[in-house]
Amino acid sequence: MITSPPNEQTGEHTGSWLGVFALALAAFIFNTTEFVPIGLLSNIGQSFDMTPAQVGLMLTIYAWVVSLMSLPMMLATRNIERRKLLMFVFGLFVVSHVISAMASSFAILLVSRVGIAFAHAVFWSVTASLAVRIAPPGKQVQALGLLATGTSLAMVLGIPLGRVLGEALGWRTTFLGIAGVAALVVFLLARALPLLPSQNSGSLRSLPILFKRPRLMAIYLLTAIVVTAHFTAYSYIEPFTQTVSRLSGEMTTILLLVFGGAGIMGSIVFSLFSDRFPNGLLITAIGTLAVCLLMLLPLSGDATMLGTLTVVWGMAIMCFGLLLQARVLSLAPDATDVAMALFSGIFNIGIGGGALLGSVVSSHLGVANVGIVGGLLALGGLGLICYTTFLFGKTQPHAEMQADAKH
């Protein structure tokens, strides 16, 4: 890791758990707002006389704006000091949420979500590398785990609480509440983060170099396939549980809580085993995800079995996301922000693609089949990781970077 001179006061020599914690809270806010519509599809649809499948397209639009803008926004902001950049990002985030809460039409709601997506594109392009950068020495994996905990808590608390608030006071109140919490997080970030001059951000010149790294390209392809598989089913978990499983609104909220809690368990598994069994854990996570999605419909009639499946599903997808994030950082240490911007963009292509595919499946085959379609895609991802593990198993990751340096 490249360090800065002491007079820059970056705080990177001793590390800062407080700074990592602040970033984890920020991650909580961003992941809450990205996925909270999943628990409010029916309510938003009622406001604008739309079906859940139609409203679900807002997830696709949001995700694809993030995917398209992640790299351009990262490059446009690559020379900006990172703490200042995060302050600007959260300012845009708060204003856009206020507009969401006041939206008089679905079109205005979509415009406000695009504003949030722009903020999201910048945030996730820099946050993982910042967490690793400011973590105490030797605690980089744990820092990523804490960041993932913030993401998981969005599933555990953010999305279910957003749903409860939306059910009780209307979905607009949920967006106002997110704006209020985000405003508080801004102050914490300002106090907790040191000055963080941009470093190792990369530039457009980094792209041809990154594209020559087969391991990295395989990770990006795997990301697109598996994330699409997951969100084909997860984007429509609310209508699935209510129309197929016949669960009440309260039980649906509990199921969302269970899924998020499982994500925290998955981040713990990642912290404990990712260093020792990186390939085995990744293959296991994808295989487990495929089984969970394929069994979603067969187990939908038994609430206990569905809850158990949800726990395993949540653990698997969290392990998968963390493993790929860590692998991208390790394969592109010379251009972390560019590599993570690409990863964030591709991840969101998967989110949007999954939401769109789930909408098509729901409209033409019925929402009951979203798990089957997602599971088949996940099996494709399992085949890809098994092949690439065999192909690159004996190749050291640094060999690719050394080859780049010779050109």
Swiss-Prot record:
SUPFAM superfamilies listed in its UniProt record: MFS general substrate transporter
Residue intervals passing through the bilayer: 18-38, 55-75, 88-108, 114-134, 141-161, 175-195, 217-237, 253-273, 280-300, 304-324, 338-358, 365-385
Location of the protein in the cell: Cell inner membrane
Entry's Gene Ontology molecular function annotations: carbohydrate transmembrane transporter activity
Record carries keyword Transport: yes
Gene Ontology CC annotation, any one: plasma membrane
rRNA-binding found in the keyword field: no
Keywords, comma-separated and alphabetical: Cell inner membrane, Cell membrane, Membrane, Sugar transport, Transmembrane, Transmembrane helix, Transport
Topology with respect to the bilayer: Multi-pass membrane protein
Stored Gene3D superfamilies: MFS general substrate transporter like domains
Role description: Involved in the efflux of sugars. The physiological role may be the reduction of the intracellular concentration of toxic sugars or sugar metabolites.
Family: Belongs to the major facilitator superfamily. SotB (TC 2.A.1.2) family.
Name of the protein described by the UniProt record: Probable sugar efflux transporter
Organism, scientific name: Pseudomonas syringae pv. tomato (strain ATCC BAA-871 / DC3000)
